[in-house]
From Swiss-Prot:
Keywords: Cytoplasm, Lipid biosynthesis, Lipid metabolism, Phospholipid biosynthesis, Phospholipid metabolism, Transferase. NCBIfam families: plsX (TIGR00182). Gene3D superfamilies: Isopropylmalate Dehydrogenase. Homodimer. Probably interacts with PlsY. Pfam families: FA_synthesis (PF02504). The lineage of its organism: Bacteria, Pseudomonadati, Pseudomonadota, Gammaproteobacteria, Enterobacterales. It comes from Proteus mirabilis (strain HI4320). Catalyzes the reversible formation of acyl-phosphate (acyl-PO(4)) from acyl-[acyl-carrier-protein] (acyl-ACP). This enzyme utilizes acyl-ACP as fatty acyl donor, but not acyl-CoA. It catalyses: a fatty acyl-[ACP] + phosphate = an acyl phosphate + holo-[ACP]. It is an enzyme of class 2 (transferase). Belongs to the PlsX family. Its EC number is 2.3.1.274. This is Phosphate acyltransferase.
Length: 345
């Protein structure tokens, strides 16, 4: 297998190197052909690499970057002042071909802006979108976009997202003729904002898109649609609400055995059995397992991790980058877009 190289913004996210460095080591252990360029402040990174496996360390190289993009930074200002930041250095490593993908848990708006400036968008795409492939009730996958890269979207952008999402579902999730829907407050054609209704009109008339209409938020995980399209505001709120509910549910399962000394032995045994069955049935819904959203529509691979990701979740984001490299996502998406999406003037 060909060697893979990922540039990683070690300083991004709520916890920085405390999470990113251990996650890197785990990803290296799982992928013997992987090399990671760890971008950030050496003084913060090096102590976390002490006494680690020598073979893993040989495939991990620290690239100095003294500055950090603050989580609360205003994108316009942070982009202008981005030179020397770990986020920009990591993206530039992809631009120059020294790395094949970039992973960051940093400021979403800044990452979006910098990625578009440094890597450029695929021809015909107005703005890249954050997309994630989520598990659904039918034990299949649902591609959801945009998840926060573009708060306001006109109808043309929603149409482009629909096309990209359909390509993603077909090429990556292996779904033939994927069903595409727009997120809305009802299924009736008259409902929704103007941009949503205008996008629906265009999608209905697009022969290469299997458009099925509107889907409400309560059907996000039912598998009713293979691709769910929305603006970044609605998508981000929907995703985080869904993840919060799932985490509460899984925590209730985890605590179901309890430590009550008055509980009979057979009741404790029953609870443990039930917990095991529920974990087996619903464990795949754990948000940590699908952390990482791809900035779809760029000429390079960029994976955005949740800022508050733990070690397991950040490792999942790195693994997603590995898969994206192996499957040559930008090239395959660009190839399909040439036949599906009309090029803009």
């Amino acid at each position: 297998m060909t060697n893979l190289t990922i540039a990683l913004d070690a300083m991004g996210g709520d916890f920085g190197p405390r999470i990113t460095v251990p996650a890197c080591l785990r990803a290296l252990a799982s992928n013997p052909h992987l090399k990671i360029l760890l971008v950030g402040q050496p003084d913060s990174i090096s102590p976390l690499l002490a006494n680690q496996n020598a073979e893993l360390i040989s495939r991990l190289h620290v690239i100095p970057a003294e500055h950090i993009v603050a989580n609360d930074a205003k994108p316009s200002h942070a982009i202008r002042a981005s030179k020397g930041t770990s986020m920009r250095v990591a993206l530039d490593l992809v631009k120059t071909g020294e790395a094949q993908a970039c992973v960051s848990a940093g400021n979403t708006g800044v990452l979006m802006g910098l990625a578009k400036l440094r890597l450029k968008a695929i021809d015909g795409i107005e703005r890249p979108a954050l997309v994630s492939v989520l598990p659904n009730q039918k034990k299949s996958k649902t591609v959801v976009l945009d998840l926060g890269a573009n708060v306001n979207c006109d109808s043309q952008m929603l149409v482009q997202f629909a096309v990209m999402g359909a390509v993603m579902a077909e090429e990556i999730a292996g779904i033939h003729s994927p069903k595409v829907a727009l997120l809305n407050i009802g299924e009736e054609e008259s409902k929704g904002l103007d941009n949503i209704r205008e996008a629906a009109t265009v999608l209905k008339a697009t022969p290469n898109i299997n458009y099925i209409g509107y889907v409400e938020g309560n059907e996000l995980l039912t598998g009713k649609t293979d691709v769910l399209v929305c603006d970044g505001f609605a998508g981000n709120v929907s995703l985080k609400t869904m993840e919060g509910v799932i985490r509460v549910f899984l925590s209730l399962i985890k605590s179901s055995t309890g430590d009550n000394k008055k509980t009979s032995w057979w009741m404790k045994l029953l609870k443990k059995w039930l917990q095991k069955r529920l974990n087996k049935r619903f464990g795949h819904m754990n948000p940590d397992q699908y952390n990482g959203a791809s900035l779809l529509g760029l000429r390079g691979i960029v994976i955005k991790s949740h800022g508050g990701a733990n070690e397991n979740a950040f490792t999942a984001a790195i693994e997603q980058a590995v898969q994206a490299i192996e499957r040559q996502i930008p090239e395959r998406i660009a190839s399909r877009l040439n036949t599906v999406l009309p090029k803009s003037d």
